Amino acid sequence: MKHSHVLLLLFVQVIVLLPLLCLSDDFVNSRATYYGSPDCKANPRGHCGYGEFGRDINNGEVSGVSWRLWNNGTGCGACYQVRCKIPPHCSEEGVYVVATDSGEGDGTDFILSPKAYGRMARPGTENQLYSFGVVNVEYQRIPCRYAGYNLVYKIHEKSYNPHYLAILVLYVGGVNDILAVEVWQEDCKEWRRMRRVFGAVHDLQNPPRGTLTLRFLVYGSAGINWIQSPNAIPADWTAGATYDSNILLT
């Protein structure tokens, strides 16, 4: 219990450093560019650790975000509406993207996939927009909506039962950030905090044996709360397997 109180106080202090736009309805001025890609999709080796998932999520309309928005990985999976500001070429709606990587260029907060960048254009003006390379934009954080999906965790391919467990947190709905993940250690009657390796990947050396119960420290419109997964990871977990937490974040 003491451990949980200390951890909560720690994250209360950290929260003041998070971008205030996370829960704002206002658009923020910035710049955006796009990266080269042979198939118009994202880099599977992005800093969030999503792999192929990061290429296909949201129909490939994804973005690398600035270090400020990436925020040491807590910004992975955040959703944004981004719209460029060149009236003859830019649509009013812009594009809705998921943050799957980090990176920044000349004053940019977004390095969009080519597909996402083109979606900001009015029909028939995509080539003109691509020719600019970098454009002024405005953006806002919006709720992520994954129809039919609860929060999911995938056992990272480098995990090795029973000595090493790493998980990748996927489908974080709403305007929520995962600040920490803990595993219940039954014999010690305490929660063990997993280390954020990078992005959305958390790991633990020598995890407890048997079924594994996880809980997540979630920051969103409801404040900071621990949410425990009703579904445990089975004792015979294997690398590459995916498990439904039965947690629906909205």
Swiss-Prot record:
Residue stretches making up the Expansin-like CBD domain: 163-245
Glycosylation, residue list: 72
Coiled-coil region(s): none
Matches recorded under InterPro entries: Expan_Lol_pI (IPR007118), Expansin/allergen_DPBB_dom (IPR007112), Expansin_CBD (IPR007117), Expansin_CBD_sf (IPR036749), LolPI (IPR005795), RlpA-like_DPBB (IPR009009), RlpA-like_sf (IPR036908)
Membrane-crossing residue ranges in chain numbering: none
GO cellular component: extracellular region
Family in the record: Belongs to the expansin family. Expansin-like B subfamily.
Protein name: Expansin-like B1
Organism of origin: Arabidopsis thaliana
Gene: EXLB1
